[in-house]
Amino acid sequence: MAASSRAQVLDLYRAMMRESKHFSAYNYRMYAVRRIRDAFRENKNVKDPVEIQALVNKAKRDLEIIRRQVHIGQLYSTDKLIIENQEKPRT
């Protein structure tokens, strides 16, 4: 993978992770983070530039979907789940 492609993929990964953490619903947030990690790990060994570009284009479309869904989720937010209200253990 060319250096510019690698940088573009890493930037896209970071943007998707950052945006998915804005989901107000815990289940959506955790699902999005898990799905993004799994998808990028699954495709980390792809070497074909054409396939890489196709995956980058798909990820860009998915990022826009995440942004839209985050916005919609913020408009129609619900109460937090019990698991979200728990304090983190002190170490």
UniProtKB/Swiss-Prot annotation:
GO terms for biological process, alphabetical: [2Fe-2S] cluster assembly; [4Fe-4S] cluster assembly; iron-sulfur cluster assembly
- Give the modified residues of type N6-succinyllysine: 47
Keywords from UniProt, A to Z, are: Mitochondrion, Nucleus
What CDD domains does the annotation carry?
A: Complex1_LYR_LYRM4 (cd20264)
Q: State a GO cellular component annotated for this protein.
A: mitochondrion
Which locations, inside or outside the cell, does it occupy? Mitochondrion; Nucleus
Q: Which residues bind pantetheine 4'-phosphate?
A: 6, 44
What is annotated about its quaternary structure and interactions?
Homodimer. Component of the mitochondrial core iron-sulfur cluster (ISC) complex composed of NFS1, LYRM4, NDUFAB1, ISCU, FXN, and FDX2; this complex is a heterohexamer containing two copies of each monomer. Component of the cyteine desulfurase complex composed of NFS1, LYRM4 and NDUFAB1; this complex contributes to the stability and cysteine desulfurase activity of NFS1. Interacts with FXN; this interaction is nickel-dependent. Interacts with the cytoplasmic form of NFS1; the complex increases the stability of NFS1.
Q: Which family does it belong to?
A: Belongs to the complex I LYR family.
Chain's role: Stabilizing factor, of the core iron-sulfur cluster (ISC) assembly complex, that regulates, in association with NDUFAB1, the stability and the cysteine desulfurase activity of NFS1 and participates in the [2Fe-2S] clusters assembly on the scaffolding protein ISCU. The core iron-sulfur cluster (ISC) assembly complex is involved in the de novo synthesis of a [2Fe-2S] cluster, the first step of the mitochondrial iron-sulfur protein biogenesis.
- Spell out the protein name for this chain: LYR motif-containing protein 4
- Gene name? Lyrm4
